[in-house]
Structure formats: C-alpha cells, structure tokens
C-alpha cells in the first residue's frame, strides 16, 4: 500500500476522513434535535430570532454544527431564513391554518369511503392507529415533562396512516404537504406564547378514539362525523377574526353537505 508523505497509508487517511464526517453529522443531528425540542417546548417562540452564538453557548458546541442544524430546520419548515438578516422560528398565521384545515377535511371527506373499504380488508389499519394513540397518551403522561414533539409526531402518523389507506399516492402527497398537525401546534404557540394545555390534549385523545371506533365499526357516516368534528374543533381555537369565522363556516357547510350525501339529511356539525 502506498504511503503518504507523513507515512500514513492513504486508505487510513480516507477512513479517518470518513469518521470525521460521521462525527460531524452525528453532532449536527444532536444539535438539530435539541433546538427542535426547545422550539416545540416554547423556549423559542414563532417569530423569535435564533442567534448562532447564543445557541452555541447554550448547547456547548461550536458555531458550525449550530449553523448546519438551523439549515436542516429550515428544510423542515420549523425555522425561516430571512434574507440578509437572520434565522427566526417560523410563524404560522391563523388564516393559513384554517385554509389548510379546510383542504385537509376535503381530502378526508371525499376519500372516507375508500378508507372504510380498506379498513374492512386490512386489519393492520386499526391496530396501527391504536399504536399511535398509545404513543400520544405516553407523550403526555407526565405533566411535568410533556413530550410535545412526540405528541405532534404521533398525531401526524395517526392521520397519515388512515389516509394511505385511500390508496392514492397523489392524495397522500398533497395531504402530507399540508402538515396540519404541526401547523396547528405552532399556530397555538404563536397565539398563546405557550404550548397546548392538558385539556386540549385530553379532548384530542377522545376525538382520535372516536375515529378509531368508527373505523372498527366500518361505519362511514360515523367516520365522517368523527373526522369533521375533529377538524372543526381544531378550527375553533383559531376563530379570532371575521375572515377566520367565514372560512370555518364554509368548512362546516362542506361537512354537512357530505353527510347529506350519505343519506343523513339535516346533519349539523356544531
């Protein structure tokens, strides 16, 4: 094996370089995870500036992994890069959220029949949803140490799991791109300057249980009511102005018309 000028074989130099990249990548992973957790916990609120020097001091690392971690969080849409200025925690507006929730509900309503048919054929759908619900319960079991990130992650998995049952990849891509569970969490954080409260989590668990029970029963109308109520209940937390109120009323009419189409006239979602 040909040696380098220092006497170290070139292959060994290559291995050392590979190891350095691995260590750096692992450190960026850890730093990104820590900053992400601080954002979910409300330590850094939407719109708040993220200063590399301050984060480096808090986390006890150099500037480079912090910069790399922030760029990763930009790609995840948790952080926003302001041209020629700095990086800030991304802000989520109420109207944007209500718009996204409306599109989400439209996707869920119009593919409810396909989801019910899949539940009839695939026993793993309900069991997968049960696993997500259990993980959500575990995330909030300790009042002094609620794992907000785990809650949002598992709630997202819950809804995406039954949408994959519609067997339409284009639909799934659109639905996943809405990212409403994360959007909802951070919109609340933006409004209240603190994470979701326990009563909201507990109500959410009840609503998710209703969705599972409807799928177990293979009852399409019941499933539609459960998903409609879940989305509309989320909307009400952001009913802060006339524009939001009008959009929410449109979403209600959409759900009620869909129930009418299932042969359940005069169904009101309230």
Please name every model-derived segment:
Residues 64, 100, 104, 151, ...:
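Residue-level recognition of hydrophobic positions within alpha-helical transmembrane segments
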Residues 40-44, 112-120, 141-145, 187-194, ...:
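Short, flexible helix-adjacent loops and helix caps
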Residues 23, 187-270:
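C-terminal all-alpha effector/ligand-binding and dimerization domain
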Residues 11-18, 123-124, 141-147, 190-199, ...:
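Short helix-coil transition/hinge motifs at the ends and kinks of transmembrane helices
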Residues 1-118, 170, 243-270:
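Short linear motifs at protein or domain termini
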Residues 95, 122-192, 207-210, 214, ...:
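Conserved amphipathic alpha-helical segments that form helical-bundle/coiled-coil interaction surfaces
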Residues 74-75, 100, 147-150, 197-200:
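A short, ordered amphipathic alpha-helix with a cationic face
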Residues 29, 105, 130, 202-206:
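Amphipathic alpha-helical repeat elements characteristic of tetratricopeptide repeat
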């Amino acid at each position: 094996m040909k040696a380098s000028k220092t006497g170290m074989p070139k292959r060994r130099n290559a291995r050392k370089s590979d190891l350095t990249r691995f260590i750096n990548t692992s450190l960026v992973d850890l730093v990104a995870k820590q900053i992400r957790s601080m954002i979910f916990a409300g330590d850094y609120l939407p719109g708040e500036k993220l200063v590399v020097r301050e984060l480096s001091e808090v986390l006890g690392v150099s500037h480079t992994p912090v910069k790399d971690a922030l760029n990763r969080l930009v790609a995840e849409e948790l952080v926003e890069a302001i041209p020629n200025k700095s990086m800030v925690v991304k802000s989520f507006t109420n109207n944007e959220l209500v718009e996204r929730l409306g599109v989400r509900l439209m996707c869920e309503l119009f593919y409810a029949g396909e989801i019910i048919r899949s539940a009839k054929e695939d026993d793993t759908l309900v069991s997968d949803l049960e696993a997500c619900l259990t993980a959500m319960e575990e995330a909030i079991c300790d009042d002094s140490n609620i794992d907000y990130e785990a809650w949002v992650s598992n709630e997202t998995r819950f809804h995406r799991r039954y949408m994959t049952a519609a067997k339409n990849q284009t639909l799934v891509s659109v639905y996943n791109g809405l990212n409403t569970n994360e959007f909802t969490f951070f919109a609340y954080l933006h409004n209240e300057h603190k994470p979701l409260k326990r009563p909201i989590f507990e109500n959410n668990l009840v609503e998710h249980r209703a969705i599972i029970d409807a799928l177990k029963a293979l009852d399409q109308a019941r499933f539609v009511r459960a998903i409609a109520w879940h989305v509309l209940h989320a909307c009400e937390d952001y009913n802060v102005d006339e524009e939001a109120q009008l959009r929410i009323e449109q979403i209600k009419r959409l759900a009620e018309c869909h129930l009418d189409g299932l042969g359940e006239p005069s169904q009101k979602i309230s």
